[in-house]
């Protein structure tokens, strides 16, 4: 969790994406669930939204818990993004193993669950940046392949804010199992077809521009078949020297049939581990 000055000026987010199949129509959709925390040391009994006109008028810095969940667009469907905000006073956290809960939204290393229900009236408030709809998820999580970012994400470089935003690709190949219910329609999520991804970002600000790409479903151009035990993850970052931003870099890992190939400035002399 965020500590020290980062607790007053920092964020942490846990991202998950995966596929689910509707058993009645066989429709396949790609879903996402994100848990995030912003400026926890400034929290009160109400979520403080930085984009809200009243809070801006009084000079209050944003501080809240947020759940963002929904479904990615498909041809003929614009997708759905739901956001719900919660006060820091509702947060419950345990360590070893890490566990986090606010309201009915639960995060742990091997399970995520929760629900969002946004009415049309609430969605009309532009400051909330949300669509209307409902989303329920209950999923087991198995993170099979992690991206190794080396020393650049250790405690020292985090403390001196060597990056604007740190990344840990803790599950660039993740298996999900469970169900999601999108606007009353149930989708089943199975490990073999979930093609899941999970990661964590933390820091003082989001990278701008934001660059992130990942895939757990790679197809060989040579054979036309799926590459087993393979995944690709790319993340952009902006390193600093003496608090001055340097040229933007990328962090990348390709896992090819079980073998990891890494490319980032944290491992300047090797491309593979």
What are these regions (language model features)?
Residues 1-273:
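Structured soluble/peripheral alpha/beta segments that form catalytic or ligand/cofactor-binding pockets
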């Amino acid at each position: 969790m965020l500590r020290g000055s980062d607790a007053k000026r920092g964020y942490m987010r846990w991202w998950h994406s995966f596929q689910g199949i509707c058993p009645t129509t066989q429709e396949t959709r790609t879903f996402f669930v994100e848990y995030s925390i912003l400026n926890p040391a400034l929290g009160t009994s109400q979520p403080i939204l930085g984009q809200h006109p009243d809070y801006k008028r009084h000079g209050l810095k944003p501080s809240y818990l947020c759940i963002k969940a929904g479904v990615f667009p498909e041809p003929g469907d614009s997708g759905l993004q739901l956001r719900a905000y919660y006060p820091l006073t509702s947060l419950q956290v345990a360590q070893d193993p890490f566990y986090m809960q606010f309201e009915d939204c639960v995060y742990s290393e091997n399970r995520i669950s929760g629900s969002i229900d946004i009415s049309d009236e609430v969605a009309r408030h532009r400051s909330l940046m949300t669509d209307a709809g409902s989303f329920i998820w209950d999923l087991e999580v198995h993170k099979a392949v992690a991206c190794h970012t080396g020393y650049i994400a250790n405690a020292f470089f985090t403390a001196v804010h060597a990056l604007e935003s740190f990344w840990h690709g803790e599950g660039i190949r993740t298996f999900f199992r469970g169900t999601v219910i999108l606007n009353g329609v149930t989708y089943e999520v199975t490990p073999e077809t979930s093609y899941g991804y999970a990661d964590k970002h933390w820091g003082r600000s989001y990278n701008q521009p934001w660059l992130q790409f990942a895939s757990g479903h790679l197809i060989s151009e040579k054979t036309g078949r799926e590459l087993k035990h393979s995944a690709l993850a790319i993340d952009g970052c902006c390193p600093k020297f003496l608090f001055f931003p340097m040229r933007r870099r990328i962090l990348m890992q390709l896992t090819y049939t079980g073998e990891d190939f890494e490319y980032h400035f944290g491992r300047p002399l090797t491309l593979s581990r």
